[in-house]
Structures are given as structure tokens and as C-alpha cells.
């Protein structure tokens, strides 16, 4: 991209030091008109200071939006219908937030006549990929500015010097290197970098901001129930709640019971491994509950097929392919599987553990009469099992006979 080819750019703006430097850099080095977009995804920060700071920089068009309900309803819940876990552990809290931010940037760009969008992701991480794949999927001709890949501010010292030269306020705690970086939204909080870069060293308790330690959690069990309708959680303890309100309440319950901590070394899409410390209190509870209600409402082969597709689905989200045709195809299959996933799950929360205490559904496929160890009154003829076993053993018997004669597998 030519240095001054951008005329008007929509910046994903947090109001923090890094994106404030980016804002000023776009104005001074690129000569671009900047439109700021700040999204409330439940990160727990006051966002009006971002508006005031943008005004201080002379920004005329400022968007500060509460997207918590949209985030949970249209992004988090569809993902949880799949029980998505990246590399078997990560609940994708950062990954699932990027498509919504990118989508709103593009919508705003089209509304205000901007020819470009910009983000504050570095050139080493996954977020640059997630943002830009979404941008190009939604607006193929959009121009993208990624300052961390372009500018000469390659050190913290240079960043601070630029900030001071352009009268960008610097909080006292930003003048030194932060001990680790934090990204947060309503689903999770992630901490990476600096003191966490050695995977052999346990994270200090100061890293955890959304959960108390399991050791410090109450010595009494917290009992709750979650109601599901077609795969989505709709009520907590019998009280109907909006998606964001329900997840917020689950976060509080998880926090108080030391639930949802994860120390993970993951494989980034860009090729390197990274260590992250994640807190997903409400999501951890929700995942356990969703799997429990599926256990009685999904057909065996449907459940197994869904489980076999989950790693691919999770990988697509992690790598930034939310708006890809293959993710949409998988989502259609997953959503179809949830038509019968309705009912109630009872849980016990205790010192970092989520324990399923019961599950019930009007669509339950579980037959106590069929599986009983007592007299089933003819519900199941055990003699039928002999033919079932013989048919399934046929290929094994044939292979075994060849094997005894020295044949290959």
C-alpha cells in the first residue's frame, strides 16, 4: 500500500496507549481522517474515557457501542453449540471476539464513506490474521492499515517518545513495561507475555483477575440449574435471562468458586507456540452443562459425528475463518443437531470443579426401562445381542484366520 493512499480510516480503538499512538500516527504520518470505533464486549472497563480521548485528538466521528448482547447471542452461543475447544482445551475467548469487532468496523466504514480500516494487533500474533480475514471477507476491496507491521516504533522507548512528542497522555503505570498483557471480554480474560513467557514457571496469583483460587473458594457447594432451548442457555435457576446477562451471572458464580482457570501452551496460526493464562469462569460452567444436556438428547451417531467435526470447527475460529463458507457449513450442521437439545441441567460448583448433578429433557433418549439391571418386562431381548455380536465380529474372524496363517493386517 502506498504510504499516503488512505484517506479515511476506521480504527478499532480501545483508548489505551497503543491505539492512541496509532490514532495519532494515522493522522500525522498518513494524513488520514480517523474514525474511532470502541466496542463494549464486557471487558469491564469504562469506555467513555475512550470517547473523550478521541475528541481530544480532534476525531469528529466517534462510535462507542455496547455489543455485549450481540456478542453472546450471535457469536458465543453458536460456538458453544459446537462445544468448541481449540487443541482440546482453549474456549476461544479472544478468537470469537474479533469477527464482531471487524464486522462493525466494516459496517461503520461503509456508513461513513471510509476507504480503510485499522487495528492494533502486532505482526507476531493471531489477531492480525483474524481481523484481516474478516475485513476481506466482508469488504474485499477494503484497505487495511496494520501499524505494528509498518511503522518504525519498534521498541517501548520509541512508542513513549512518540506519545510524549504528540501530547498523548501516558498513565504512570504505562511508563514502565507492563508485567504481562491482558485481553478481556464477557467470555474470558487472557494474560500473555513478559513474566508469562517461560512455560516452566507457574503464573503468580496477580495474573488472575476474574477468579479466586480454588484453594480460597468456599468450602460449601453452590447448586445451580441451567435451562436450554435448542442448544442455547435461556434461564438460570429457573429465571429467564438474556444471553449476556446469563453469561455475566455464570461468570460471577464461576469466579466465586474458583472455576475456569487454564494455563496453556498453544500453537498459533502464524507458526509459533505461545503461552497464555486464561480465565473463562462462566464459559467453563456453560460447556459442562451443554454437554450434559446433549448426552440425553442427541442420537449416538449424531453426537459422535458432531464431536468429530468439533476440532476442525474450533480451528477455523481460532485461525480467523469465522466468515468462511466452511465455517458456515459446519454451523448449519451443528445448529440442526440442536433442535432437540432442550431441557434442564443441575450442577454443583465446588473449588474449581463443575459437577453434573442431574439432567432432564422432554426430548430425552434415555430409557431407564431399557437399561435397568432389574426385570425390564420384555423391553429388551438380550438374545438379540448374539446376532449383533456375530455380525460385527465377522470381519475380525476373517482377519484373524488370515493372521494365523501369517497374513498382513
From Swiss-Prot:
- Can the keyword Amino-acid biosynthesis be found in this entry's annotation? yes
What SUPFAM superfamilies does this protein's entry cite? Adenine nucleotide alpha hydrolases-like, Argininosuccinate synthetase, C-terminal domain
Q: Which CDD domains match?
A: ASS
Q: What would you give as a GO molecular function for this chain, any one?
A: ATP binding
Q: Which residues bind ATP?
A: 12-20, 39, 120
GO cellular component entries: cytoplasm
Reaction catalyzed: L-citrulline + L-aspartate + ATP = 2-(N(omega)-L-arginino)succinate + AMP + diphosphate + H(+)
Q: Report the subcellular localization.
A: Cytoplasm
Q: List the keywords (alphabetical).
A: Amino-acid biosynthesis, Arginine biosynthesis, ATP-binding, Cytoplasm, Ligase, Nucleotide-binding
Q: Which positions in this protein are listed as binding L-citrulline?
A: 90, 95, 126, 130, 181, 190, 266, 278
Pfam families hit by this protein:
Arginosuc_syn_C (PF20979), Arginosuc_synth (PF00764)
- The positions annotated for binding L-aspartate are 122, 126-127
> InterPro entries, alphabetically?
Arginosuc_syn_C, Arginosuc_syn_N, Arginosuc_synth, Arginosuc_synth_CS, Arginosuc_synth_type_1_subfam, AS_cat/multimer_dom_body, Rossmann-like_a/b/a_fold
Which pathway does the record list? Amino-acid biosynthesis; L-arginine biosynthesis; L-arginine from L-ornithine and carbamoyl phosphate: step 2/3
Tell me the domain of life.
Bacteria
Q: What is its EC number?
A: 6.3.4.5
In the record, the note on similarity to other proteins reads: Belongs to the argininosuccinate synthase family. Type 1 subfamily.
Q: What is this protein called?
A: Argininosuccinate synthase
Question: What is the species listed in this Swiss-Prot or TrEMBL entry?
Answer: Acidiphilium cryptum (strain JF-5)
- Taxonomic path: Bacteria, Pseudomonadati, Pseudomonadota, Alphaproteobacteria, Acetobacterales
Q: Which gene encodes it?
A: argG
Amino acid at each position: 500500500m502506498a504510504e499516503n493512499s488512505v484517506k479515511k480510516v476506521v480504527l478499532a480503538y480501545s483508548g489505551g496507549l497503543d491505539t492512541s499512538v496509532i490514532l495519532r500516527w494515522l493522522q500525522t504520518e498518513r494524513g488520514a481522517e480517523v474514525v474511532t470505533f470502541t466496542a463494549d464486549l464486557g471487558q469491564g472497563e469504562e469506555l467513555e474515557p475512550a470517547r473523550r480521548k478521541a475528541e481530544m485528538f480532534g476525531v469528529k466521528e466517534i462510535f462507542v457501542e455496547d455489543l455485549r448482547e450481540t456478542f453472546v447471542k450471535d457469536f458465543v452461543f453458536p460456538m458453544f453449540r459446537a462445544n468448541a475447544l481449540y487443541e482440546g482445551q482453549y474456549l476461544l475467548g479472544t478468537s470469537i471476539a474479533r469477527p464482531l469487532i471487524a464486522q462493525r468496523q466494516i459496517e461503520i466504514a461503509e456508513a461513513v464513506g471510509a476507504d480503510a480500516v485499522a487495528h492494533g494487533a502486532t505482526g507476531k500474533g493471531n489477531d492480525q490474521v483474524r481481523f484481516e480475514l474478516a475485513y476481506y471477507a466482508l469488504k474485499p476491496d477494503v484497505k487495511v492499515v496494520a501499524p505494528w507491521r509498518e511503522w518504525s516504533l519498534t521498541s517501548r522507548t520509541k512508542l513513549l517518545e512518540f506519545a510524549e512528542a504528540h501530547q498523548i497522555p501516558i498513565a504512570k503505570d504505562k511508563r514502565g513495561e507492563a508485567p504481562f498483557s491482558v485481553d478481556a471480554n464477557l467470555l474470558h480474560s487472557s494474560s500473555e507475555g513478559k513474566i508469562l513467557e517461560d512455560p516452566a514457571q507457574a503464573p503468580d496469583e496477580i495474573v488472575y483477575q476474574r477468579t479466586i483460587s480454588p484453594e480460597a473458594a468456599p468450602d460449601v457447594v453452590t447448586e445451580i440449574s441451567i435451562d436450554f432451548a435448542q442448544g442455547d442457555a435461556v434461564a438460570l435457576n429457573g429465571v429467564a435471562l438474556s444471553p449476556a446477562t446469563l453469561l455475566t451471572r455464570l461468570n460471577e458464580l464461576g469466579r466465586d468458586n474458583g472455576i475456569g482457570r487454564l494455563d496453556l501452551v498453544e500453537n498459533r496460526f502464524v507458526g509459533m507456540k505461545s503461552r497464555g493464562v486464561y480465565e473463562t469462569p462462566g464459559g467453563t460452567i456453560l460447556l459442562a452443562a451443554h454437554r450434559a444436556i446433549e448426552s440425553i438428547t442427541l442420537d449416538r451417531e449424531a453426537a459422535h459425528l458432531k464431536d468429530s467435526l468439533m476440532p476442525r470447527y474450533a480451528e477455523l475460529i481460532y485461525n480467523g475463518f469465522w466468515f468462511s463458507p466452511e465455517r458456515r457449513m459446519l454451523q448449519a450442521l451443528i445448529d440442526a443437531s440442536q433442535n432437540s437439545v432442550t431441557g434442564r441441567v443441575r450442577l454443583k460448583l465446588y473449588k474449581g470443579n463443575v459437577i453434573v448433578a442431574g439432567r432432564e429433557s422432554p426430548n430425552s433418549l434415555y430409557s431407564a426401562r431399557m437399561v435397568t439391571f432389574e426385570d425390564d418386562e420384555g423391553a429388551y431381548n438380550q438374545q438379540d445381542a448374539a446376532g449383533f455380536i456375530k455380525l460385527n465380529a465377522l470381519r475380525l474372524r476373517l482377519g484373524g484366520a488370515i493372521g494365523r496363517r501369517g497374513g498382513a493386517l
